[in-house]
Design a protein with these regions (language model features):
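Feature marking well-ordered beta-strand scaffolds used for ligand recognition
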Residues: 1-274
Length: 274
C-alpha cells in the first residue's frame, strides 16, 4: 500500500509476506526493508512487526481497539537523510514508532506513542520536523459521515525519543460545518518534506482532510499552530459521495501544490501565495 524510496538504495514499506501468518487477519502487514542496490536482485535485509501479531510470537496478541478495530499494520515508513538511522513509522491502532535502523537487519524500537484508545486509531503518517524535534502525526479517517470522529493531526514533542509528548493538534475544519457533508471527514496525508526536489519546510505544514479539503498550517510556534490557507473544491462530477474528498498532497520546489481527490475529482494544481 505504501513505500518509501528516497536514497536509491533501500525500499522501506509496509507489506505482507507468505511466511508471515498473522494472529488476526487485520494484522497482516509489517515493516520491511529491501536492498535494491543491485536492481536485478532485490533482497530483503530487515523486517519488524508489532509484538504479538505473528503466529508463534512469545508476546500475546495485542488487545483490539474497543470501538473501531482497524488492525495493527505498518503504514508510512519514512526515512530521511537528516537521520538515516531512524525510521518514522505509523502502525495504525499500534500508534507511532521511532525506530533505530542503523542495523537494517535488526530494527529496534526507540520510542512509541499511542493515544488509541481512548482516541480512534489508524496512525498513518509520522512527519519529523528536525529543526524543532517535533513530529506531526496523522490518524486517518476511514469512515464516512464522521463515524470515526475525531481523526486528528497531532503535534508531538520528540526531544526525548523514548518519552514523546503530545503538545497540540493542528486546527481542524469546523466539525459542525463538515461532518454532515458526506464522505470522510478528518485527517489523512501530509506533504512529507520528501528528499530531493520538493518544498521543504519545518514551519509550513500541508495536510489533507477529505471533505475538509487541503489545509496549510503555520507551525512557527508548535504550541499554537495556526491555519493560514485552505482549498475546498466543489463536489466533482460522478463522485459517489456528495462532496470533494481531498486525499493526498505534494508540494514541489517551485511552491506548486498538487492534491488529488479520492474518487472522481482528479488532480488539482494550486499556486502557494503565502
Amino acid at each position: 500500500h505504501q513505500l518509501w524510496f528516497a536514497d536509491g538504495e533501500y525500499v522501506h514499506f509496509g507489506g505482507g509476506s507468505d511466511d508471515f501468518v498473522p494472529t488476526n487477519p487485520k494484522d497482516d502487514q509489517f515493516y520491511r526493508c529491501i536492498d535494491v542496490r543491485n536492481p536485478t536482485k532485490p533482497e530483503e535485509v530487515g523486517r519488524w512487526w508489532y509484538p504479538g501479531t505473528r503466529e508463534g510470537d512469545s508476546a500475546p496478541p495485542p488487545p483490539r481497539h474497543p470501538d473501531i478495530d482497524s488492525g495493527f499494520r505498518a503504514h508510512n515508513t519514512n526515512v530521511y537523510p537528516q537521520r538515516p538511522d531512524r525510521m518514522y513509522l505509523g502502525y495504525l491502532d499500534g500508534g507511532t514508532f521511532i525506530m533505530d535502523i542503523s542495523d537494517k537487519s535488526d530494527p529496534k524500537v526507540l520510542g512509541e506513542w499511542n493515544p488509541h484508545p481512548p482516541y480512534p486509531g489508524f496512525a498513518h503518517t509520522v512527519l519529523p520536523l528536525f529543526s524543532k524535534d517535533i513530529l506531526i502525526v496523522t490518524d486517518e479517517s476511514v469512515k464516512d459521515d464522521a463515524l470515526d470522529w475525531p481523526k486528528l493531526a497531532w503535534v508531538v514533542d520528540a526531544r526525548k525519543e523514548d518519552n514523546m509528548v503530545p503538545i497540540a493538534t493542528l486546527p481542524m475544519p469546523p466539525p459542525d460545518d463538515f461532518r454532515n457533508r458526506g464522505g470522510r471527514f478528518g485527517a489523512h496525508n501530509l506533504h512529507e518534506n520528501r528528499p530531493g526536489p520538493s518544498f521543504q519546510s519545518d514551519d509550513l505544514i500541508f495536510g489533507t482532510f477529505f471533505n475538509g479539503g487541503l489545509r496549510v498550517f503555520d507551525l512557527k510556534d508548535p504550541l499554537q499552530p495556526k491555519e493560514v490557507a485552505y482549498f475546498v473544491p466543489p463536489k466533482p462530477d460522478n463522485s459517489p459521495v456528495a462532496t470533494a474528498q481531498i486525499n493526498d498532497v505534494y508540494v514541489d520546489e517551485n511552491r506548486i501544490v498538487y492534491c488529488v481527490d479520492r474518487h472522481a475529482g482528479g488532480l488539482y494544481c494550486l499556486e502557494l501565495n503565502i
